[in-house]
Regions:
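Glycosyltransferase catalytic domains, chiefly GT-A lineage
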Residues: 1-175
């Protein structure tokens, strides 16, 4: 399982046999350019579908070790074959998120998402994904303090058994 530090899960999750990712993403050239954008040597991308929507991996659960090995070997081979370029971030995002979806589609491995891509910005209470809000909170201490207070209140309300951790953090920060 993989969890980004900007993704908060506020409920217990059920795990089964399918891959679980945060959500699907639209294919846009500025984030997910066409395959001919990538300059690679000695690596041929298998006959993957270019139309399958990428999987955001802010949360990722992969229960099948055979699939995990297939996907990671494809992603690593792709990154190792990357020719010097100006934008390795696009290569990394392709290898991590788009290739994951392509591999799942290719192997017919079932995929489930925690959030629906078409309702990402609608209110819901199960997950918090900070995305661009991270920079806003870095730049604005009042915004950051407000977010921290809301998280503490949520933890105290929904997970009172962990309230002691908040108290320990307060105590440690006062030393």
């Amino acid at each position: 399982m993989m969890l980004d530090t900007d993704f908060i899960v506020w409920r217990t999750l059920e795990f089964a046999d399918e891959i679980i990712a945060a959500h699907r993403e639209e294919i846009s050239d500025d984030i997910y350019p066409p395959l001919d954008f990538f300059a690679v040597k000695n690596h041929v991308i298998p006959d993957f579908s270019e139309t399958v929507l990428p999987l955001n991996t802010a949360f990722l659960y992969v229960p099948d070790n055979d699939f995990k090995n297939f996907y990671t070997s494809q992603a690593i081979a792709f990154m190792k074959s990357a020719v010097d370029c100006d934008d390795y971030l696009k290569y990394m995002v392709f290898a991590e998120q788009r290739m994951l979806a392509m591999c799942a589609n290719f192997t017919q491995t079932p995929v489930k998402t925690l959030l629906d891509k078409d309702s990402l910005h609608f209110p819901q209470s199960d997950f918090t994904h900070l995305w661009g809000a991270k920079q806003a909170m870095r730049d604005n201490s009042a915004l950051r303090a407000d977010f921290v207070e809301k998280c503490k209140a949520r933890i105290n309300r929904d997970f009172p058994e962990y309230s002691y951790i908040i108290e320990r953090i307060k105590a440690a920060s006062n030393k």
